[in-house]
């Protein structure tokens, strides 16, 4: 069963490339195990929020910034592994 990863990002801020980069990296890490969807906001929000199985695990608005370091990526990997174990 695929784990749903949802990314809400600021479309008006031009964050789509950051979303696509994260999507590819996650797909490479978990081939055929994830259902990844992205939603760009039409207005300026500053969002880059990542939800794993409905739970917020990364929030730019909450102070996490972008998923731009290995430690931030590994935090997502850990959340996905936990969700896969429960599925």
Curated annotation (Swiss-Prot):
Q: Where is the signal peptide?
A: none
Put simply, this protein is called Selenoprotein W
Q: Name one GO biological process term.
A: erythrocyte differentiation
Q: Does the keyword Ubl conjugation apply?
A: no
Looking at the keywords, is Cytoplasm present? yes
Query: Which family, according to the similarity comment?
Result: Belongs to the SelWTH family. Selenoprotein W subfamily.
Q: How does it assemble?
A: Interacts with DPYSL2, PRDX1, YWHAB, YWHAG, HSP70 and HSP90.
């Amino acid at each position: 069963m695929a784990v749903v990863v949802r990314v809400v990002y600021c479309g008006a801020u031009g964050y789509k490339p950051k979303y696509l980069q994260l999507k590819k990296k996650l797909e490479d890490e978990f081939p055929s195990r994830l259902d990844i969807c992205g939603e760009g906001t039409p207005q300026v929000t500053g969002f880059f929020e990542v939800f794993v199985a409905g739970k917020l695990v990364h929030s730019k608005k909450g102070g996490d910034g972008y998923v731009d370091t290995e430690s931030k990526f590994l935090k997502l990997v850990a959340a996905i592994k936990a969700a896969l174990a429960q599925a």
